[in-house]
Amino acid sequence: MYGGEEFGNSDFYDDYAHTGDPALDLEYERNFYANRMPENVKYFLMNFCQAIKEGNLYDIQNMYENTFPQISDHHFDKTAWPDEQEVGAIVDNDKVFLILYKELYYRHIHARIPGGPKLEQRINSFFNYCDFFNLIISAQNPVMLELPDIWLWELVDEFVYQFQNFAQYRARLTDKSQDEIQQLCVNHSNVWSILCILNVLHSLVDISNIKKQLEAISQGIDPQTVAGDFGKLAFYKMLGYFSLVGLLRVHSLLGDYYQAIKVLEPIEIHKKSAYSHIPACQISTSYYVGFAYMMMRRYADAIRTFSDILLYIQRTKQLYSTRSYQNDQINKQAEQMYHLLAICLVLHPQCIDESIQQVLREKNYHDAMFKMQCGDLEVFKSFFVFACPRFVSPCPPAADAPMEDYVKDPMEHQLLVFMDEVRQQKDLPTTRSYLKLYTTLPLTKLASFIDPNASEDDVSKLLIRLLCFKHKMRNLVWSKGPSGLEGTFKSGSELDFYIDDDMIHIADTKVSHRYGDFFVRKIMKFNDLNRKLKNINI
């Protein structure tokens, strides 16, 4: 009757058939995708969803920090996790969980997939962040969602990172077709735009009232009295705090260092805070604050910021050493800060903690520092390029721009600004080295040291150089107050001088090491430790 047709061939059937009954279709999808997924992945996703529904912070944090990376290493090292459709069938299409899962899904693609994410994945990741932030910001009442602080920090940090990554991707026109450029500039011009990023971060700061809460804490007032309905919840409060750090990073990437420090005004960045319990957040904050200070020529503040955080890293390394992804990131940022600290110490010599000096010696930074002191501009340049943030432009290239690679333009501009400052100071170490040898020195003699064939014109130029020395060694230094922009002008040089007629009078202002204070602090710390040990009941 049917002419011997073969109906046994599976190609004639749809593996993903629907019955028309929503309940049966959902059950079919769940079974269909579950059979394609490894059992441990399926159970992890179901348990992860359940823990988030119940707000079980301990289980959420354990699965986020331990189980998810372990499964990623075992099953998805160089591939993507299951997509939204597959996961949705297992977790009953739970809207909140799927948004959070997709945040991890796209983060994994950015970090692990060779070649990086495709344009469509970058766009989808942006819209997923929009869904998440709209869910929590646009709600009339606070969303009852609890996530561990480490996830909230990494969510905000990843949001800023993906903006930075997309800005660099968009600026690289040489590897794109005309259709792709048209799509980026016309169809998706608002995707990962700087205005969207700033709007989201400021909205999180505002809805949490985090600035008012920080001001209340500094005045000894209960922050709950000014927190509002949203800010009372740890979820919103921590998102607001981390958004301040996100704004610091964004403004630093744009090269607006004044505004970068300005957004942190409620945070007393030189003091420990109850909010600074996430090591990666504290380290990132200090890196961008220190870099901003360096670019603002506030070297004393930059040196203090870098020294404090590098000491913190030395003392707390065991807290994150078991987490390889955090360890790698923190080690890289620490290495960058050692490079920046070396630059600052050459431009503005001063005493620092002996343990930091020891690291600089062990890692042979002193050789490079000696070359910088001798005026080797290439070493300055290589240190800056290695240690600086990956700057971005707030405006993408126009659709009709020449087909060039614009990625390096922002960095080259910042390098130009930095090297211009270095060139103004490159002769100062030589001047300082001569002045340190004398208490009085005639101008003509100093001029002859610098140039044996010095003329009267060279003596006049020497006066300009000495004035430059005075000017460059006088910095604005923070002393107290919540604003990192405040401070008083102080001379940071180890020597001071004045000129009377043609004679230079020099005073060595170097403060000798006070080892007694060091030992007193260690003894007090040891006694405190003894008291705590005696109070422990075994």
Curated annotation (Swiss-Prot):
Major subcellular location class: cytoplasm
Highest taxon listed in the record's lineage: Eukaryota
GO molecular-function terms, A-Z: translation initiation factor activity
InterPro entries: eIF3l, PCI_dom, TPR-like_helical_dom_sf
One Pfam family cited in the UniProt record for this chain: Paf67
Keyword Heme: no
One GO-annotated biological process of the protein: formation of cytoplasmic translation initiation complex
One Gene Ontology cellular component annotation held by this UniProt entry: eukaryotic translation initiation factor 3 complex
Family according to the record: Belongs to the eIF-3 subunit L family.
Functional description taken from the UniProt entry: Component of the eukaryotic translation initiation factor 3 (eIF-3) complex, which is involved in protein synthesis of a specialized repertoire of mRNAs and, together with other initiation factors, stimulates binding of mRNA and methionyl-tRNAi to the 40S ribosome. The eIF-3 complex specifically targets and initiates translation of a subset of mRNAs involved in cell proliferation.
Quaternary organization: Component of the eukaryotic translation initiation factor 3 (eIF-3) complex. The eIF-3 complex interacts with pix.
Protein name, entry field: Eukaryotic translation initiation factor 3 subunit L
